[in-house]
Amino acid sequence: PTLSLTQDSALPYNFQFNAANNVEVRRAEVNAYIQANVVRDMIMQYAPTHPVIPGQTEFRVNVAVSGTCNAFYDGSSINFYNSGGGCANTAFYDVVHHEYGHHVVATGGSGQGQYGEGMSDCMGVLLSDQPILGFGFQNNCNAGIRSANNTLQYPCSQAIHTCGQLISGCLWDTRNELVNAGVSNYRDLLKLWCLNSVRLHRGDLIAPNITIDWLVLDDNDANLNNGTPHYQYINAGFSRHNMPGPAIVGLDFSFPDGLPTNLAPDRTNTIRFDVLPLAAQPEPNSGRIGYRVNGGAVSYVTATQIAPNQYTVDLPPIACNQRVDYFFTARAQDNSNWSSPAGAPTAAYAAVTNYEPTPVRLADNFQTNLGWAVTNGTGLTAGSWQRAI
């Protein structure tokens, strides 16, 4: 069929497709055409650098394909079945979104499998802002065929359509975290993260590296250690499916003079360290050093703040030939505690108390003339130095 309209070029006009709306195949054609373009338009708006799709001017959308109760993507077209076998005509909203989603995944560089099924389900979730895929697919408008509102856990080894719900579940739970926090532009954020993450993914599995991809897309300072603007919501949503993001670091420690591995015995040893803000702000005057000798009990010494976030600390005298494990702590203004190394006091830096060897000022094996001259003192009668080879 064709559709034509005569118009004044200066005025906007709208084409009306399928005005009668009384023929299943015509309705399927219109639905499939419009809904495929809805997904494409979403890609164009939120992921304009996605490969292929922005410049693709022709893509086959086939309806009335022989069969019932299914639809498919074959790499160059999306295809939909007529009604029958207890199912509706499959060319309708989120089923079309799903099949075009396979095209998004393929052009983005990933395999299909569980990832392709799940990410394709996400297209419908992003557009409808509800978790059920395929309301009415089986002629029941109160039920669908899959749901993003699920408790599926990573790793998943079930059928690919089942495991695909792992990523749609992460999307839906992240959505709920944003909504509950009152983030008004949550739909825009979800589309940005989800659609652009496709280009970062490879393979056909759903794994926690996807969480990192979302965080990278949300990040604003090229440092995931201090979190991202929406870290708490993304991490919470993905954690519900056993795909947490990397732990953020509140405070960072640096050591202007380095970390000693040799401490002078029987006297005070002074160490400098700085406490730097990452995801949190340092609490002034909260720096300390903890240490233990030969695996004994941990003792603490409060450091002296010599400038904002800069400290010196004096380790008390320790006898010679002792192993000293030590670490640094500080408190953030949100009352969280941080240490260097992470995991202290179990993890610690190590040093020994020992006298440093006397530095060598000159080495001469007397086999080569290094240009020294020997002058014997007045009255010397024997034992003068001579270089001999």
Cite the ranges covered by each PLM segment.
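Extracellular protease catalytic domains of secreted zymogens
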Residues: S4-D252
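Glycan-association/targeting regions that enable binding to alpha-glucans and other polysaccharides
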Residues: I234-I389
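Glycine-centered loop-to-beta-strand initiation motif
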Residues: P1-L3, Y13-F15, A307-Y311
